[in-house]
A protein has these predicted regions:
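Conformationally flexible catalytic loops at phosphate/diphosphate-handling active centers
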Residues: 1-54
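Short internal beta-strands
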Residues: 11, 83-90, 151-154
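Glycine-rich beta-alpha junction loops
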Residues: 12-18, 64-66, 157
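Short, well-ordered secondary-structure micro-motifs
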Residues: 20-23, 71-72, 99, 163
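Short, solvent-exposed amphipathic alpha-helical segments in soluble enzyme
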Residues: 25-27, 71-83, 140-145, 166-167
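Flexible, glycine/proline-enriched loop segments at strand-loop-helix junctions
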Residues: 34-37, 61-65, 166-167
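Anionic-ligand anchoring segments at beta-strand to alpha-helix junctions in alpha/beta enzyme folds, i.e.
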Residues: 40, 47-125
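Glycine-rich, acidic loop regions that bind phosphate or pyrophosphate groups
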Residues: 92-178
Length: 178
């Protein structure tokens, strides 16, 4: 599944690299992945909305899952309604246009001043399609508010549960539409 993709390295011996092979034509046929847009539990979505409404300094962290889900338009609509700033992971670059008023830029080890400052002060982190890698979280030093809570929107159960979050497990596009 695209939510479980990761780094791949193929190491082939030099003699294998120089060989030719008659590949069957079927190997090159176009394949289309149909993504099932898993929806989250309605009660969990209601709870997430309550947390967002009560939050004084929320921050959205947009990860690569935004792109896998094709949810950039839904993210834009969501931030226009909620007025929540957005920081992007390396894989989430381009989730919002660079000149969007909600755009803070990169977060984490090589993050922008604004994104890093706001992540330290935020009382609510809304992770959408992020794995919260050490590069993104600056080894967890990015979130310094002692009362910070997390809402994680992610197809992958493991990533949705990180940081003791309110797990909103499902497809980012489907969830942001709700």
């Amino acid at each position: 599944s695209p939510s479980e993709t990761g780094t791949v390295m193929l190491s082939l011996p030099q003699d294998v690299q120089s060989e030719s092979f008659n590949f069957p034509c079927d190997l090159f046929k176009k394949k289309i992945w149909k993504i099932q847009r898993q929806r989250a539990d309605k009660d969990i979505i209601k709870k997430a909305i309550e947390w967002i409404k009560k939050s004084k300094k929320p921050l959205i962290i947009a990860g690569g899952g935004i792109h896998y889900s094709e949810a950039t338009e839904e993210l834009k609509k969501f931030v226009d309604i909620t007025n929540i700033p957005v920081a992007e992971t390396f894989a989430g670059k381009g989730a919002l246009k660079y000149n969007d008023s909600h755009q803070l830029g990169a977060i984490g080890v090589t993050g922008t001043f604004g994104a890093v400052k706001i992540s330290k002060e935020s009382d609510l982190i809304i992770g959408i399609g992020t794995r919260y890698s050490d590069f993104t979280t600056s080894s967890k030093t990015a979130f310094q508010n002692k009362n910070v809570k997390f809402i994680n929107i992610n197809n992958n159960e493991f990533d949705a549960a990180k940081n003791g979050a309110l797990m909103v497990q499902g497809d980012a596009k489907a969830i942001l539409k709700e």
